[in-house]
Amino acid sequence: MGAPTQIPIETSPLAWLDAVERQRRDAGLRRSLRPRPPVGTELDLASNDYLGLSQHPDVIEGGVQALRIWGAGATGSRLVTGDTELHQQLEAELAEYVGAAAGLLFSSGYTANLGAVVGLSGPGSLLVSDAYSHASLVDACRLSRARVVVTPHRDVAAVDAALASRDEQRAMVITDSVFSADGTLAPLRELLAACRRHRALLVIDEAHGLGVRGGGRGLLHELGLAGAPDVVLTTTLSKALGSQGGAVLGPAAVRAHLIDAARPFIFDTGLAPAAVGAARAALGVLKAEQWRPDAVLQNARELADICDVPETPQSAVVSVLLGDPEVALAAAAACLDAGVKVGCFRPPTVPAGTSRLRLTARASLSPDEMELARRVLTDVLLGPAAARR
């Protein structure tokens, strides 16, 4: 046989990426990866490790013990070989903690949202989603094949109107409990009332509420609505619990249905045992050390005061609005140069004109660390502060 014929490529099918890259660069919207060292030298005000549990010795030991007993990987789908007693123990303990009847673990909070929304909807359904819902909820709506209505942020009247005018037999309202970009709270009580007026299911992403609101049990529990039969919670194990993975929590019938119907559960490898063991240990620490959620909120209030943010934080998130993405990038870089790492949110994560520094408070911040934050943030924001007002 002769050498294979070489077919010349007139134009690369990926040539369009060059133009897109230039557009992103010119708009200040390029992203990059920056590996962190095992032990950081900067003050961390960017991670979602709200309770400081990712480095807690009990949490690390929980992961190590699970690794020794069950091995490095789950070895398969939960429906084949990837299920362990550890998975089911954590599901039961998480559900009990937030006041739900049952729980189901997923490999991430992202896949938990995909599994819950897509698995509980489909053609002939209506999904009503807040405009600021997390990207995983947005993608779940897109994959659902349901009709989707996106309502203005925290607008209960718009939700009510969308539900009232529907023709679909089934309807679902979708919201974060704590919105990730600005830390505001969803009007859960009012949303649930609207759902009940129109026979709709309420799906709440408690990723930023678990471990912080309601003494750690989440915003729904704080409002006295835990265990409602027409509410499904999703959450992540990667924020307050300092591990990795996600969960859907709600009625037992929902768990049973998702085992049969949630594609991100059926066709994904089960959550690694070490992540399950670490999350289970973190939940134990959260139950035992009840000061941690209050400390997060107190530190968030202090950070907001430092940054002259007028609104009192309702979560671990403190949002410092700067507007221009280049200004936000420069401010974040200046903070890092001075020893403080902060988040920087730009479009498309947030709407155009609302680029911001996103600070996340942690329960374990010391007085010396708070003083460093005060000094650096005050210095850095002296310039950009005028631009954001």
Curated annotation (Swiss-Prot):
It is an enzyme of class 2 (transferase). This is 8-amino-7-oxononanoate synthase. Homodimer. Its cofactor is pyridoxal 5'-phosphate. Keywords: Acyltransferase, Biotin biosynthesis, Pyridoxal phosphate, Transferase. Pyridoxal 5'-phosphate binds at G109, Y110, S180, D205, E206, A207, H208, T236, L237, S238, K239. InterPro entries: Aminotrans_II_pyridoxalP_BS, Aminotransferase_I/II_large, AON_synthase_class-II, PyrdxlP-dep_Trfase, PyrdxlP-dep_Trfase_major, PyrdxlP-dep_Trfase_small. It catalyses: 6-carboxyhexanoyl-[ACP] + L-alanine + H(+) = (8S)-8-amino-7-oxononanoate + holo-[ACP] + CO2. Pathway: Cofactor biosynthesis; biotin biosynthesis. The keyword Transferase applies. Substrate binds at R31, H134, T349. One of its GO terms (biological process) is biotin biosynthetic process. Catalyzes the decarboxylative condensation of pimeloyl-[acyl-carrier protein] and L-alanine to produce 8-amino-7-oxononanoate (AON), [acyl-carrier protein], and carbon dioxide. It comes from the Bacteria. Belongs to the class-II pyridoxal-phosphate-dependent aminotransferase family. BioF subfamily. GO terms for molecular function: 8-amino-7-oxononanoate synthase activity; pyridoxal phosphate binding. PANTHER family: 8-AMINO-7-OXONONANOATE SYNTHASE (PTHR13693:SF100), CLASS II AMINOTRANSFERASE/8-AMINO-7-OXONONANOATE SYNTHASE (PTHR13693). The modification N6-(pyridoxal phosphate)lysine is found at K239. Its EC number is 2.3.1.47.
